[in-house]
Amino acid sequence: MADIEELAEQLVGLTIQEANELANHLEEEYDIQPASAGVAVAADGGGGADGDAEEEEQTAFDVVLTGIGGNKIQVIKEVRSITGMGLKEAKSLVDEAPNPVSEGVSREEADDLKAQIEDAGGEVELQ
């Protein structure tokens, strides 16, 4: 049981880039296809009034960088500090905006990340 808990902690601690690399590795090596969020919701089977209420009360948010404003270097530095990415990866993420900076975070954490990026000069949207 401790091994499973350690694995869960490692998975939760992955950066976006590391999670993407893991998904690619699982797909290439083991032919495991990542499920989209829509499929997971559909597989849940809900569909009644309860399902509608859950959709209205969003608990997980994606922090999406939509623009870099006037201070690209500061935005790249902030993205690096948030994601743990290297310089090249963070620069690519910023240059190719809109891109998610963090996914599936709480409202409070999403607001904090949004404020950090906006303070650096970036434009952010919560989804």
Curated annotation (Swiss-Prot):
Residues 105-117 have a biased composition (Basic and acidic residues). Residues 93-127 are annotated as: Disordered. It comes from the Bacteria. One of its GO terms (cellular component) is cytosolic large ribosomal subunit. Keywords: Ribonucleoprotein, Ribosomal protein. PANTHER family: 39S RIBOSOMAL PROTEIN L12 (PTHR45987), LARGE RIBOSOMAL SUBUNIT PROTEIN BL12M (PTHR45987:SF4). Pfam families: Ribosomal_L12, Ribosomal_L12_N. GO terms for biological process: translation. Homodimer. Part of the ribosomal stalk of the 50S ribosomal subunit. Forms a multimeric L10(L12)X complex, where L10 forms an elongated spine to which 2 to 4 L12 dimers bind in a sequential fashion. Binds GTP-bound translation factors. It comes from Salinibacter ruber (strain DSM 13855 / M31). SUPFAM superfamilies: ClpS-like, Ribosomal protein L7/12, oligomerisation (N-terminal) domain. One of its GO terms (molecular function) is mRNA binding. Forms part of the ribosomal stalk which helps the ribosome interact with GTP-bound translation factors. Is thus essential for accurate translation. Belongs to the bacterial ribosomal protein bL12 family. This is Large ribosomal subunit protein bL12.
